Amino acid sequence: MEDYHISRGKHFYTIGLSYKKADAEIRGHFSLTEESKQRLLEQAKEEGIDGILVTSTCNRTEIYGFAQHPFQLIKLLCEHTHGTVEEFEKVAYVYKNKQAITHIFKVGTGLDSQILGDFEIISQLKIAFVRSKKLGLVNAFLERLVNAVIQASKRIKNETEISTGATSVSFASVQYILKHIDKVSEKNILLFGTGKIGRNTCENLVKHTRNNHITLINRTKDKAERIAGKFNLIVKDYADLQAEIRNSDILIVATGAQNPTISKELIYPKKELLILDLSIPKNVSDDVHELENVKLIHLDHLSQMTDETLEKRKQFIPQAKEIITEVESEFNRWLETRKFAPTIKALKKKLKTMKDDELDFQRKKISDFNDEQAEIVSNRIIQKIMKHFANHLKGDAETTDESLELIQKVFQLEEVNK
């Protein structure tokens, strides 16, 4: 990307891993908390990286950024997570320049989501953009790229039906409960964790189960109380967790902690219990599988569920791809203009210097020289010359490099390459 005069880093990379090759455990090793994202960005800045975005969801962790070599970004990820380079190499992907651009469009528009048409990732991209911008880590390229991805995402939402129907991890969990549990409205349901996934799950539970026995527990009680107040639900203290699990028929875990919050010891083994773990890393310990009366389902299983809604969405993929191609092509055309932006800027400066020298010469020769009119006329001439050069460079992409070289040679624009 050095030809585009955008970053000190030679190339634009996407490095990351997703549900496609990395299971929940490995994704958990590479998941980033809000604090670790911040520390990663601060280190990137210290190391001279001038353009970088970081996202981490239950389905993927990715870094988009400029670097001399992708290992700069891989090293940052491994240093701020529990993952190793060896683990990363087995399941990861690395995309460079145009491929990296294509990938972020695919991800940001929901076509690469574990549940087709789930647009949660676009909000994560927006948050990542704001976080990086606050640290001065968003260059012109990243700003334009993220805005283009947001534009494509909006158009796909508005012009296709790829996101119609309730389909998300939170909805899939409720759908699973409805399919596998009889008389759901009579069961005691405990929701542990009231972050974004927890809130969405709570709304879907209330809407689809008609259950009046839903209890919320969160480490920070006031968060649970705000949600409970909206739906008239019960809130219990975190200290009551074990007792509430014992009273429950269904336990939904959406705590988002870095280590398991539910272990075998917390569960009463003689009662049937369905546990849905919606967290990455896994928040329910694997030893829970040893309990005969307990059925543990992780979000990866829920995300694989297909229903009529998902099948219906697939027919809109070609239309969505057309929109992406259109917006991505527009972005790439803008990117090509970055190639000649420094030359155009240097040419304008050169013409202005030539103009000033000539006006000074004429001013000395002509006694009644009209400075104001001369400035207006000469500036308009420069403007027209610049427009012709710019139009030529935009219109003939195949010979852009040769044209730039000729302009730089004719007008002696040595500063462009400095």
From Swiss-Prot:
Superkingdom in the source lineage: Bacteria
Residues spanning the membrane: none
Catalytic activity: (S)-4-amino-5-oxopentanoate + tRNA(Glu) + NADP(+) = L-glutamyl-tRNA(Glu) + NADPH + H(+)
Pathway note: Porphyrin-containing compound metabolism; protoporphyrin-IX biosynthesis; 5-aminolevulinate from L-glutamyl-tRNA(Glu): step 1/2
Residues given in the record as substrate binding sites: 57-60, 113, 118-120, 124
Record: active site: 58 (nucleophile)
Function: Catalyzes the NADPH-dependent reduction of glutamyl-tRNA(Glu) to glutamate 1-semialdehyde (GSA).
Oligomer status and interactors: Homodimer.
Record-given protein name: Glutamyl-tRNA reductase
Organism: Christiangramia forsetii (strain DSM 17595 / CGMCC 1.15422 / KT0803) (Gramella forsetii)
